[in-house]
From Swiss-Prot:
This is Probable nucleolar pre-ribosomal-associated protein 2. Required for 27S pre-rRNA processing. Has an early role during 60S ribosomal subunit assembly. Keywords: Cytoplasm, Nucleus, Ribosome biogenesis, rRNA processing. It is found in: Cytoplasm, Cytosol; Nucleus, Nucleolus. GO terms for biological process: ribosome biogenesis; rRNA processing.
Amino acid sequence: MSLQTLTKRIRDKNGSREDQIDLANKLFRGEVDVYFPNKEEFIINFLLDRLKENSNLTCVNIGYWQLFLNIWKSDKLSGSFRVSAIRRQSLYPIILNAFEYLIKEFKKDVFLKISDVFVCVYSNLNILYISRSFPDQISLLFSRYCYLIASKIDDLLDSHPNEVFKETLICVIQSAVHSQASSTKAQTQFLHQTLGSILALLCKTQKGDPYFSFLNAVLMKCVLTQHTLDVLLLTKKDSSMTLCSLLNAISFEPINLKAIPLFFIICADSINFHLSSVEKSISQQKASELMYKLFSEHIAFLLSLKNLPEEATLDCMLSICQVFENDNLHRGHSDEYTFAMLEQLLELSVKTLRQNTCWSTSWEMLSSLLAIDFDVLLPHSKILWECIKSVSHQDDIHALKFLKRWVRASAKARILDSFCIDWHLNVQTMSERSILTNRDFITSFSAVAEVSLSQISIKKLVTWLMSSESIMSENSNRFVVYYSLCKSLKRESYPAHLVPNFELFTRSIFNASLKNFNILDERSQALLCMCQISHVQFFSSDMSISASVGMKTLFEDLMAEKSRGLSSTVWSLQLLLCYLEQCLRLNTLHEDTTFPMRVVNYALEYSSKALDKFAENSHLILLDMVDVGKPDLVLTLLCRWLHMVHLYSSRTSITSWIYSIASKFYFIDSLNLETKDSVLESNWERFISSTETYELDSIRDSLIDCLIRLLCYSSNNAIDPVSAPGNLDFDNSAELCSSLTRFTPKNIDFVLKSLIHIPIHSITKNQRTRLLNLLIIHEKLLSDKDNSAHISLRKIIYTLMKTPCSSGFYRDPKIIIDLMQFGKTDLSFHKVHVLIMRSWIQHLDEGNKSEVILKLLQLILADFRELPLETITLIFNALVDSLPTSKHIKNSNDILSSVFTINDMLIDEMTAYLSKKESLCSGTFSCLLACCNSVLRTQNLTSESLNKLHILKVGIEEKAISLKLNELPFLENWILFQCLLSFGGDDFLKVVAYMVYYRRTVGEMSFRVSDFELALSRLSTNDADYAILNILNLLTSNECDEFDYSVLMKVVGVFANYSDCFQRNRHLVHMVLLCCTHVFYNQTLKPATLIDSALDVFLCFVQKTSKFISLDSFNTILTALSTILNLKELECEPKDHANLILKIIQILNGLLFNHRSYMSGRFHVFYSILKSLLYSMVQHDSEMKKIKGIALMNFYKPKKVPIHVVQSFCRLLTTWMNPNLMHDSNKKNSSLTDAERLFVKATTKHFVFLLTDFMSAQTVYQIDIQVKELLTNCFYNVYENLSNHEKQMALVAMNAPSKSLYQKFVNDYLIFAKWNEA
């Protein structure tokens, strides 16, 4: 096909549009065999011509848009062509035309592809600014875009505009509006043309959605500028450009009203944006004015809507009011126009309340109006009280919210006393249980009154209430306001002149009412007691004595009338307990304890009965002020009256009472009740966590007896729960086990959680023994599948065994054998089992320790075939590990004989295991190896046993691959096993080879240094030299990775500590140090894992005398330290970094103490190291990690250094400046030798700059106060040793801020440092 034919077929206006786009695609992909230079430019021009056709075959054909996008994204088009192509044919009319077709028939893929083309083209600023765009054209484009999204929002939820599209569209709109002579007018016109579509999209979204964020960003940055907001909000009301006029120009349906609050939020965000921007384009006063106008314009518009449903309009107004009340823009009082809008909202809300429509919305509206401007509502209090009276439900949360805000508003307006009077008058005319007696409202009022009412106001109110005729009426609400006022008083600040009023209430009302107390209704009885409780806290000694008769009368009536209601009984008991507490405080009870005992015991008895029909309170917001829940008395007894219970109740009664509470949780399945979030459970946790519980002996002992009693509970009553705490011992454990009920893990979990909170020292030895016995028995009753319950039990058992139990627990070894048997295949039990065994052995009585251990070993021998191997190995390991500390015990030969016999039997078991073909349990095999290791450490094995172990070792090596035992516990024990059996250089190197090999398999591996020390002690001189030389050869080879180096360095550290080969060969020391330093220069390794091991080797050598280290070795260590402190990359946790710094300081200490003769001439190196360490002591800012001219410790992250590291650094520098501290303890002022004096003088020539660095660091970094104080005291020692010339030199080297700090440093030294030394 010729070029002319090809172009004609593609551009033919009468040709098939589908064929043409296919041919254009082939041409672009190079599938047409024709030479066509600049074919991409030809295709773009063709596509622009076709896309502007008014036909759905082209402008909404995804093939055209996809091809355009592919070519435009390619690098085949020049920049000049792109600019000229869009200048000739803008994409705006093409996209508008496509949107017209998409409105009729939506195609999601085409719409998204057009958006991609728009971004791809106009994200280029050169193209954007040469494009011919007009505000009307762009506004129409944006309007149709929003309309399309709003109409097809369900299809586009997963395709919201990204940041690139949003930024591109913002640039396009800004370019269009700023091209006009008046950008403000263009922006206002843009909003006028697009507002309908914007609101249509807003009504389909909500705040926080991607489309809302998109509209918010576009309008904030492009349209709602400072000047546009002035035009919309601050122009004359008859202007057509006001916001209200723009909104009125749109026809609204009820659903569109949802968009108005969101549009209000966008406008408010725009005002906030201009206020908080860097340019600060508007002031706070201007922002407040704009916010008020924005609010009033929206409310005025909504009030003008007459044909829409009232409910929808009111909801919209409420949303706007709630946004307005919570913003932080408006300040001061409302202007006249806004105040008028608020009054209209008040009238509308009251009207709907009277009509009993939109109930909740109207109350929320009134609450919001109070928050906006309470001056609108407070003058209309009479109307508001009428609305309150119309509330028929006490739990109306919307009206309750309004009431609480009304109280706070009255307090702000300083008319809270008037509110109280109106409240008292209105509550008399309402039902007994009304919203004015709601508990939440009373609490809220009391909190406000406590800080708002003056003493004079309270005095006047109380006097008025006491003189009111209604106070003597029979209305049960007559005490509501009086009680609320009394509740707001605090004993620390109450007015003393109120006491006569309280006395008058007690005499004239309370005591008078007691004569006919049983005649009163339950609510009046409860309210009388509640008021009197508020008075009791202000009792004087005379008042408590005068009130004693009344209290006894009240209690006698309470005892006589068994059918009294719950609230009346509970409040009466609370009053009696409060009275007794005050009498104790005033010491007016004298010797009469009968009455307090009767009151407390009756309270315990009644609270237990109330719990039998357990029902928790609903939310407090639903309760009347006198309402109580059945557990309420229990809660106050647990958390407030515990001391009263301790003083006036017997231990038996307290135990029974605590048991009745705990049983509600323990027997949870019988109640079928979930108590996870219950008030009772939270207060129980508070009770068992309180220190007061354990300070009161009777409470503490009763709690522990209760837990024992719960564990002793029996379904067939074979064991009496009451007598169980006193009689239970280990002798009847079998009988007890057969009679106990199988409880669920939930039941046991309650006891365990309770035991966790009890301090171990609070539990007596006998109680610990009983608890241990019961917990062990319960563990047997739990299912084997309840691993979590078993582990929890074991942890509690271990906690209880930390302190000695009764001797019976240690007499019979069967107990410990039974305890170790569960979880034999679960490694999660192993750790806690080991701890339990060690505690048991530790607390064995020294007198019969040998007999018990021997008896235990004999039991193991007798039942070797019946007991699980895991149990045997666990007990055996713990026993053998304890033998070195128990060599002085009797029968040691018999014990060792039994140990070796059991060990031989275990070796036979392992040999039998190896002969089997099936797979082995790595856990079991690991435990068996651990036993062999423990016996090897005793170093008392016979040659026959050693031969067996060598044969076993060979057997494991032969089957190492088939065993597939690659788990960490087995590998650690296997390596230690070989280490303990090594008797030559080759054996030791084989152990090292195993360590390197398995280190790659399982990662970090730990080993016992003492075992390697034992292996080293068996090596001859030649074997030790042979082993260390081979290890050094490995370190210098290039075949090791970082894991190999880590293991080998640890082995070298063991050699350095425990072998004498380095003492014989100083050249060998230098080789080791060179190998360690080689690690830091190897670029293929990550040195973070190796530095710690290398520093351990350095530390070991520097702590030895100069016989070990030559001058070359000394220089090697200094070079290594400098290298570490200048590493570019090191990934470590802050804790590891602090450990590295500490080790570097320890190495410097070692050099200073043992190798000072080598330090001359190298002080500049030490200065560089100490300078890096000094800058590691300060807390770095994230933006200031490095300062020009300062060598920082690069790998050290900007985290705070632990204080003990700073102390070590200060100790090093102090010792350096006072060498006599190294040999003359606590004699800092003793005279120095000539050599020491020269050493200090040579040091200060360099350390004077360290002092200037410290001053400079204080001007750059924010140093922790404690760190700064330690460093300052430390540098006093440096300053003390400086000559006058050096002091002046330090001053010259500093800048102005550092000089100021230095001068203060010198003055403080002259004032404090010398005085401290004296």
